């Protein structure tokens, strides 16, 4: 690149030599070779002149001119500047002078230019406002604006953010650049045209070499200001300021450091070295680019984040040439036409260029443009300075941005205020231009908090801290000042919020609870539903006229013949009540569906079947309806065994119309599924509509059966309409079909008897009917109304109007109800009155029949009581009838009677079975008559045997022996007089045995209960009978003693002597001969018995307890023979 530049410069010189006739512009340059190398040093800035000349020629300027340059190193010395100026202007008469780059020497050079009328091009530290005085310096011009404009821009920034308390800090150096800038800024702040009064609390000049003094200044600023405006000439001074401010803790969000600059560098420095360059291509000022790394970059960076920079706009269009200029400026100065061979020029390297090199470039470029714009071939015209200077006002794009001078040869500046974004790259937050000395601010951000003050906590800093600069003037915190009020307010607000929250929570809870309660009303758990047990075809037995019977206690004793109920329903138990259920597919229920179910459950009308709820937790949805015990109209018609008169049918039709009218006026709007199967009948023969309002639930069947379509209106069949698409007139058509079923007392369309085929062919009658209905036409297909003669013709006409082919021609339900009301017979109010009037006709007949049956019942009860009393003791029978248990009872002393007909077997052989029965019946009947005259209980009679007892179950003291004796005598007296009709020569003889003692009595058995006696007394009485003689009363010793002791001299007895009794041994027994006053009988032939020895053999009876019906042994001839054998053996042994 260096070789190329050298070639281009030499080539341009040779080309210029080839045009010896062109005018030569002689340029005198007052430069500073050893002063401020980083800013105005000739080694780092002088190369801008040949580069500007090259740039002019590349853009078509100064083609007709040759240039001759003469450089004098006046540094910034006033004497050397005056000497060089006189030499340039007076002695050598140069056309234009450049420099010097310092303010004070430039004043002298400008004064000489006024005297000698030579244009002077100023650059470097020449921003003082006095250079704008055209009367004093008419030929001095510069591309740097006046520092007074910087003061105006600073004032505008302070006014924008409301800062009126500031500190001014500037660095001291040999050129006094910052002191002039600060003076102009301060002058602008106190300008009378400035509306905001700004207080400068501190104005201090600091020195980079005096750190202690600088720190003291910062300490004073901390105590008095938070908005600090400072001016630093070099990058090192800027970084020094940031480091020291950071060390003093001035990098918090309270501080704003405003840096003033007029070099178009912003947060950058003119250096080619940088770790991370800014978007302007310059190195950031916080980097240690001129010294060795010191580790303080982060500290400096923290202060930079709290900094704003006011600088000239750096919007350069030809950035590519600027980069070229930056890299080659130190090489260009060594080449012709300057050919600087000074050690400083030769030692310069490509680390960067001087800060004011771009201003030197622009001011020479402006001069070249002015020369060209004179547009004249007269060489003398270029000596017209006034005309030349007037051309300086032509605007152009330079290396410092847009350059435009006003009529006073002062640049019209465009300032920008820079800040750092979150990535620490500089951004322009506003543009400030000057129009007629007035600042015009143009903001470049949308949100001040986030775009400008993000490093300040998104809050604009104040010029005075709230708590003062020393933190001792903090206002009393609001909480401390109003603690009591706040405490009370918090409590009240808390209670209020708590109350509001409680109310809202309660409202929400109540609303949810109410919704849950409403949902629980229609939700029925599947576990509550159960299918009743079926016994055959019936659930239980009941009358033919009723399907459900409730007991008087209101229990669920219900029964129903399931085969006679419509197949659409399933009968189940809900708790203890029978209900009807319809099955539906499981699906998701929306909130609207749930609200519909709540409304549906509340729907109530006397002609609507009550919807109880929906079971949704089973394998299928079950809609639960109230049980209507008589089934549906379809069920009644299908049974065919019920007779209805006209009024009965009329009332049913009226009930259907009333229920349908109510539905049409409700939120449901229509029924949509009206059929005879959905018209249910309750106990009172009242019709109730069912299966309405659940069209959003899908049935188990995917599509309606053909039978259901028999009730559908023609327009519904043609369009396959859903319930939501139907019109109420479709219900009116269905009502007419149901009414035709009732009037004809037949199933819809008389389906079971239809035999015609479709188009002459035999086929499905349902399909034919549906097809004919859909077909329509002028004579639509309808059911035949063949009714009884007593049916009102107007009612038939109404039915025909209701099934009209045109839906609009059908009457609505309200008109139907009015027409039916007009047809109601005046003598009858309702169906139940009609039924009651029919029942009254049977009332009297039923009452007479009930009375007769009641009398018969009483009579039969008496008979049964008498019969039961004969079979069991009265008190025992009463306890058994009451369902009480009869405990066995022990009796201390009773008398037991046994009897037997002597030689009954021989007698029975002479008689037929019927004669035997008649004989026993006559004898025992007389015996029963005799028993009734005495206090004796007949235990039983088995065959010809007879068992009686006295003293139980009614205790009668000692009277029992006399009652048995009197009864026995009565039996003998009857037998003595009794004659057998068919055997007159035969006699009935009785053998009697009597014994007294203790006994146990009780009831044995359940199916045929018997009152039985237990104990040895009974066995002994039986032995007395079996060992007795015909027509004699054989008594035990105990019975005899009891009779003689208690009833002496009343009865005649005779000792039989000792007798061997089976199971008892030898016992002394007695004969009862009769009453003493009445006894004329001879003593029985028992003398031989008295001769028996007193000592007899004993026989042991192993069975001492007899059964209820003891076996009575026949002790007649065989026993006598055995007795004789025993007597003989004893007599022989004694002898």
Swiss-Prot record:
Per the record, what ranges lie on the membrane's Cytoplasmic side?
A: 505-1135
Q: Does the keyword Glycosyltransferase apply?
A: no
Per UniProt, the ranges with Low complexity bias are: 546-560
Q: What is its EC number?
A: 4.6.1.2
Carbohydrate attachment residues: 37, 193, 209, 251, 349, 375, 431, 436, 447
Cite the residue spans of the region called Disordered: 535-560
Q: What is known of its domains?
A: The protein kinase domain is predicted to be catalytically inactive.
Which family does the UniProt entry place this protein in?
A: Belongs to the adenylyl cyclase class-4/guanylyl cyclase family.
Q: What protein name is recorded for this chain?
A: Receptor-type guanylate cyclase gcy-4
Source organism per entry reads: Caenorhabditis briggsae
